[in-house]
Amino acid sequence: MSSNRRPKLRSVRRTAVAATSATLAGVLLAACGGGSDSGSGAASKGPVHIKVWAWYPQFKQVVAEFNKTHKDVQVDWVQAGVGQDEYTKLKTALKAGQGAPDVVMLEFQELPTIQLSKGLLDMGKYGANADKDKYVDWAWKQVSDGDHVYAIPVDGGPMAMMYRADLFKKYKLKVPTTWAEFKEEAAKLHKADPKAYMTDFGSDETAAGWRQGLMWQAGSRPYTYAASKLPDIGVKLNDAGAKKVYDYWGDLVKNKLVDTQSYATTDFYNGLSSGKYATYIAAGWGPGYLSSVAKKTAGKWRVAPLPQWTAGGNAQGDWGGSSFAVTTQTKHPKEATQVARELFGTSEAAWKIGIDQAYLFPLSNPILNGSYFRDKKYDFFGGQQINKVFVPAANGIGGFDWSPFQDFAYNTDTSEVGKALQGQTAWSSVNDNVQDQVTSYAAKQGFKVSK
Amino acid sequence: MSLLRQQGPAAAVPPSPSVEKVAGTYAAGRKTGRRTAGLSARTRHKAMGLLLVTPFGLLFAAFLVAPLAYAFWLSLRTSTLVGGDHFSWFANYKQTFTDPHFLSGVRRVVVFGLVQIPVMLGLALLGALIIDEVTSRLAKVFRMTLFMPYAVPAVIGALMWGFLYSPTFGPVNSLTDALGLGKVDLLGHSLMLTSLGNIVTWQWTGYNMIVLYAALQGLPREVYEAAKLDGAGQLQTALRIKVPMISSAIVLTLMFTIIGTLQFFTEPRVLEPTASSVITPDYTPNLYAYNLAFQYSEFNYSAAISFSLGAVVFIGSYLFLFATRKRSGLK
Amino acid sequence: MTTAAAPVPAVTTDRAPRVKSSARGRVTVNAVMVAMILYFLMPFWWLVVAATKNNDALFSTAALWFHSPGSFFDNLQQLFTYNGGEYLRWMGNTAIYAGISGVGATAVATFAGYAFAKYRFPGRNLLFSSLLGAIMVPATALAIPTYLLLSKVALTNTMWAVILPSLLNPFGVYLVRVYVQESLPDELLEAARVDGAGEMRVLFNVALPTLKPALVTVLLFSMVGTWNNFFLPLVMLNNDKLFPLTVGLQSWYQGALIQSGANALFTLVIAGSLVAILPLIVAFLLLQRYWRGGLTVGSLK
């Protein structure tokens, strides 16, 4: 829910689980038979089984690859839920002190929340610091706190602008390089075809990360937080960068130059394929998503860098990204850490699946800067080497802290944006309202808040 | 709407004539054989009763009493993200009744109920009166069609309506578009409650209709056959005689509907992802309690909210029963 | 019951207008019925139509009419094979949950309802009166504590976590008790006892056969309750192999909306929804006489 991601690809069939033939009795016996967990192999000499929660379907092959190349450790994959559903289950299991997996897939913005509830194992104690240089600097900072390592980065979401080259040609639009140009072109397009919009302003919770990414680009750094400095936290959700973004988009919305359909709707998907939207401002994982949602527009799309606030600038933002963390409930911290580090890690075989089928955007340096990824041509984008846009974007992303109450912050932001859309509050007061609510929440939760 | 609605029919069951007949003849032949129960028989009797009720008692203790007691204990503690938790007596409850999120949710479901409940039960009553009176094939189809949505999981029902409400390909918008009325944002702020009300009405009208119908079928025919002979029309018979006679059943369905409405949860939760700037986490009190616990890990405060909601429901339904005591006692 | 062929003769003149008005009334009533049928049927109609479409057609053709070429069988084939046939597995799970919970809940409710109606034992009144208060408790309030308690005995994330709480059906107990009181006279039981039947035999040979309509009703409604339950399994289960249909379909839908790219999944969610509700509708239609019997026995015309 908190981010719009995880492209799903061609129907990957699971052959191993021949569930079809499982008789009801068999299922019943297996399921009712015993307790829940795996990995209690204890004294016996078989391989250690590590239970992993992750939700994208292509993960099946990645696991198969891991299991093929490892003898002492085997991964058991479970799809516990997608996004927020998975986090909910993780939080409940942590509260109960039982039922969490060994390794769990978490988006970056969830890490501080789970870490604060003492759910994440410090992998630094099991050698994870050795991986520091293998990952993009800003990503490593998101998962670590000094020598404490709470997760291993997997993929990221550097933002860029995908656009319909054919529509741009038809309406004689120029590919905008600044947000001011973006607005001009938006007006031109909407005038030429009142049913078309330059893009869709994501107002829902799914797009909270999208809005945050745009603020990130505009220089907003709402939180100053590190687990080691508890209970201190800096909260500044109404800084200049954040305000700039809502002033800008509020203006576009009021002038009806962009649509305001929720991202998590079929209507939005349809808009991408029907030509209703001329651009899709998205992240490094976006191409996979777009190419399967808007299949029939294959070849018509291109990717350009994110428009800038100042001409010639190089400010970038990130939307979404995930990591593998080890929970404190694991009985095999060493092996679980190994799984988190090596499931993708720098494995070319795993990343080939990740890149070609799951459209993950690697944060692992050798893969990111390797020629296979950088030079890959995408038919959907008319043969464009789109990563030549995304990779520099990824390298231009600076440091960024998340809060340990990110769900609350995103929900509050979404509610306030909803009110502004409805005309109940002014766009210019959205940031201040969010700031008020979030700081008072944080104070009540025992943080020492500096504004 | 809520679990309780799924748990079964709320109708009293009139006795079967065949059973009575059997019982009558059986008993008649044996009347003389009656004897007073001896002490040992009474003990056996007591033991049998206990034995039979034990499985239920255990389940009741394990899945109702224990969780409730545990939740109550949780609600008396306060925990924060930083600083751990401590015993705080009724601090959470004090906070609940001044919490604008909770109160706005309560207000919303009350407003929702004031409109949706009369519409739904009105339709249910109308339907029940019709199928009580008309026996055509159409009436049979009518009865089953109205009842069918009850068999649809609430999740799937809300999902179907989510598609139907779509501004791009939903039939409602195709219609308004064709009529030149433009798009209607059925999932926007102004219409969301109506759209939710529509889903609930669609899902539960048939069920309530069947319950009321069962009550109508239990009425002695003679009463209104007589009225008809007196020249009363079908409409008059329905309104003046039938409706008052099933008033206790109406009160019952009304009460369960009110309870369900106060606990409103499933439909807003299923539509939430597609319209999250409208259906905020505090949209209904129950949704708020859910989000507090499952999203924000505020288990203690969430428990207090749930108990407060339970108290509101409890007091509300007893007040309601008290106010309608005369009416429900009519029968 | 009030057919046109009513005994006519001996009529006076003031009868004419009433016949007219009742004819008009019949037209009105029929019109009301047709309108309501259309409304209540519409989503089902949409579901059937949508299930025959592929993704493109689903999002680009009129929602309430078929589009050719249809892809109903493709959709079904995909539904049953997607991800190793997990849909079939969920269906099997649902059948197990509904079956065991339904039968179990009915048995428990029958014994308890019968005991409440026919026996006096310590704690009887207390237990029965708290039973009615039980339905006022919101399900969300019970979810977390039940989860925490079950996890203490390592039952979360097993089938039992769904089945055991579903066995508790206070309404069923209430229904059986009322039914027993109304339709099972003490004399009947007493007579059997005099004949030398033990309490168990009285229950199984005398009481149960009489209670059949009530039992079918309780069984059907508790099965439906479990079949349609979403919240409990959502909270209790972490393993997708144990999901029932409701949770599984929701996870597909969630995945389709959020991870996107899920072109295929929208058609799957729709076809899956159709297949998921069919068994219940068929059950209700076929068992109509029984469950309506449970509600209305004794007053059939």
Feature roles, as predicted:
Chain A
Residues 1-50, 68, 128, 439-451:
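Short, low-complexity disordered leader/linker segments with a strong preference
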Residues 108-159, 210-216, 302-304, 388, ...:
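Hinge/lid segment of periplasmic solute-binding proteins
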Residues 65-135, 169-177, 269-271, 275-279, ...:
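Extracytoplasmic "Venus flytrap"/periplasmic binding protein-like
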Residues 44-57, 73-79, 102-103, 150, ...:
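Short, well-ordered beta-strand elements
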Residues 148-154, 159, 183-234, 277:
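Extracytoplasmic/periplasmic solute-binding protein
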Residues 112, 286-297, 310-411, 443-451:
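C-terminal lobe and pocket-closing loops
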Residues 186, 231-261, 306:
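Glycine-centered hinge/linker elements that transmit conformational signals in sensory
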Residues 100-102, 131-167, 197, 313-317, ...:
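A structural signal for short loop-to-beta-strand junctions that line the ligand-binding cleft
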